[in-house]
Amino acid sequence: MKLLSTLTLLVSAVAANPMFHTARQASNATKPFHLKTADASNEKHNDLYVYAYHTGAGFNDAVLTSDVDTASTAFLNGTYTQFDLKTPFPWGFNPIAVTNYAQWEPVEINVGYGAEGFFINSTGLQWSEQQGFGGWLVCDWYHGAPQLFYIYRYDEPKFPSSCSTVNLQVEYTS
């Protein structure tokens, strides 16, 4: 009985050791990158970089700028897209769930891991179709800068003239 208790304690201590978790996370992470718009249906929405626009404690909207120095650096951690906002907290890409029958929804960069299901293919960053992802959308919106949205794939949306469908290309920083 004492042997079993000792082994259980040993396994728990090893499993809780942060050294093992850090190594596992690092092996699943990609090189750092910026997300840059391409193939926009409106030319003025090409070559823009995603950055976190602060909207409240722990909350940011994903907006866009032509200034690469303002761009937020991202990386893929498994199937989570996370951002390095120079804080001790993880910041995750978070496409907001469809709750209001909208044809497109905002994308946020919030404290935490964010949504899972992201991957990179030949057209750039994608999200899970099972979550309703139908592509990326950029609109001139209320922050005084273009804002990033995702298209809800189960509708045939009609976008305002200030919006463009785009791809989010991955531009590695190192």
Regions found by a protein language model. Name each.
Residues 53-100:
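Short, well-structured hydrophobic secondary-structure segments
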Residues 1-2, 18, 31, 57, ...:
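Short non-domain terminal segments
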Residues 8-11, 73-74, 117-118, 136:
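Short glycine-aromatic motifs
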Residues 1-25:
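Fungal secretory targeting signals
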Residues 20-56, 105-174:
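Extracellular glycan/ECM-engagement signal in secreted proteins
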